[in-house]
């Protein structure tokens, strides 16, 4: 068996990566400071992966929302909270990665939904960690606020010099995944019902990022096409 293709460059839109090896998203609190910027540990962590030869590196999920959901106690990765600090650390990180030819796509999430107490969901459904409590349902205005913050974060990331982003979408039961599943989305407006409506949030994020950042800005979307959990498909 030949593995030659794994070591060949790959072009994704305007972004060229030196090989087919990538580092998947990983969330570690130590990689960021209290204001969401990359910490010294974070800079060293990602630089080590680039030095090791990975062509593409994904960050753990950033959570842009500072208006609707409460700040989760273990998640400080909110670029819009202190954008100047975030940009300074990002520029330094990209300089380190460029030395090895590696590219990075920051992952951006619409939110936790039922996975974090106090957060909003597509519908009034039980929280995962405490099913005795029901999560409040997002209003249409709140959905728009969340989408707008996703787009604003993509614009900030482009200004930092990142070639694109990955939207943390239909994966592992987080908010966009909850919107996609009729099992959790009981809405009767434009964001519920038919599959097209349940995917509307993801589509509006994709279209909004492309409109704001340009067609040459790479937008990856993390999708799990099948969930091996009862009632999730």
Spans of features found by a protein language model:
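Flavin-dependent oxidoreductase catalytic cores
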Residues: 1-233
């Amino acid at each position: 068996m030949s593995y030659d293709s794994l070591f060949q460059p790959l072009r994704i839109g305007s972004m060229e990566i030196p090989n087919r090896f990538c580092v998947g998203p990983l969330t570690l609190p130590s990689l960021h400071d209290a204001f969401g910027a990359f910490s010294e540990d974070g800079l060293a962590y990602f630089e080590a992966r680039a030095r090791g030869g990975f062509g593409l590196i994904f960050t753990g999920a950033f959570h842009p929302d500072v208006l609707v959901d409460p700040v989760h106690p273990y998640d400080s990765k909110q670029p819009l909270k202190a954008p100047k600090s975030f940009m300074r650390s990002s520029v330094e990180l990209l300089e380190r990665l460029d030395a090895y030819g590696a590219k990075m796509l920051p992952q951006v999430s619409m939110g936790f939904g039922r996975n974090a107490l106090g957060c909003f969901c597509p519908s009034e459904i039980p929280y995962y960690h405490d099913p005795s409590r029901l999560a409040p349902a997002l209003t249409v205005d709140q959905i728009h606020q969340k989408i707008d913050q996703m787009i604003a974060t993509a614009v900030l990331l482009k200004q930092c010099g990142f070639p694109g982003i990955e939207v943390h979408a239909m994966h592992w039961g987080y908010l966009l995944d909850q919107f996609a599943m009729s099992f959790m989305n009981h809405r009767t407006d434009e964001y519920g019902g038919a599959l097209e409506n349940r995917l509307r949030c993801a589509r509006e994020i994709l279209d909004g990022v492309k409109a704001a950042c340009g067609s040459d800005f790479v937008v990856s979307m993390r999708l799990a096409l099948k969930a091996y959990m009862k009632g999730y498909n």
